[in-house]
Amino acid sequence: MVPKLFTSQICLLLLLGLLAVEGSLHVKPPQFTWAQWFETQHINMTSQQCTNAMQVINNYQRRCKNQNTFLLTTFANVVNVCGNPNMTCPSNKTRKNCHQSGSQVPLIHCNLTTPSPQNISNCRYAQTPANMFYIVACDNRDQRRDPPQYPVVPVHLDRII
């Protein structure tokens, strides 16, 4: 009885730990709105090389992000996708605020190859260019902090297909 209870408690702790890690992956820095954080992570590729471009994101999160996709398009173009028909979000079936792009866009997918937990500036990434459709989640803008020209804005890159 005791070993089963102990094993169950360990499994529960591991599960809670995994949920905490997963939840922390979707935390935005407090100085950003969700739309601003989307633009920083997925539109503003500050360098042609993933290793350099990811340093910006990693510095905000204080960790090496495992992967990231940069859409080589404008924020305004992604905002326009928010006007496409609503669909269920593939990554979260309870969310109905996703929209699929009507055409493929060039993108660069960055994948962490060399983690460096002690010094995030040493994280290294491989990059894969592609042309793909994408699905974004969109929400109403933050009325106090987002520009008024876009009432609905992208807040999450849900999937590339």
Swiss-Prot record:
Active site per the UniProt annotation: 42 (proton acceptor), 156 (proton donor)
Gene3D superfamilies: Ribonuclease A-like domain
Signal peptide: 1-27
Compartments, record wording: Lysosome; Cytoplasmic granule
GO cellular component: extracellular space; lysosome
Enzyme Commission number(s) from the entry: 4.6.1.18
Carbohydrate-modified residues: 34, 44, 86, 92, 111, 119
Keyword line: Disulfide bond, Endonuclease, Glycoprotein, Hydrolase, Lyase, Lysosome, Nitration, Nuclease, Signal
Main localization category: other
Reactions the enzyme catalyzes: an [RNA] containing cytidine + H2O = an [RNA]-3'-cytidine-3'-phosphate + a 5'-hydroxy-ribonucleotide-3'-[RNA]; an [RNA] containing uridine + H2O = an [RNA]-3'-uridine-3'-phosphate + a 5'-hydroxy-ribonucleotide-3'-[RNA]
Residue pairs linked by disulfide bridges in the UniProt entry: 50-110, 64-123, 82-138, 89-98
MF terms (GO), sorted A to Z: lyase activity; nucleic acid binding; ribonuclease A activity; RNA nuclease activity
3'-nitrotyrosine, modified sites: 60
BP GO annotations: chemotaxis; defense response to virus; innate immune response in mucosa
Alphabetical list of Pfam families matching this protein: RnaseA
Residues the entry annotates as binding substrate: 65-69
Quaternary data: Interacts with and forms a tight 1:1 complex with RNH1. Dimerization of two such complexes may occur.
Family, per entry: Belongs to the pancreatic ribonuclease family.
Record's function text: This is a non-secretory ribonuclease. It is a pyrimidine specific nuclease with a slight preference for U. Cytotoxin and helminthotoxin. Possesses a wide variety of biological activities.
Protein name: Non-secretory ribonuclease
Origin organism lineage: Eukaryota, Metazoa, Chordata, Craniata, Vertebrata
Name of encoding gene: RNASE2
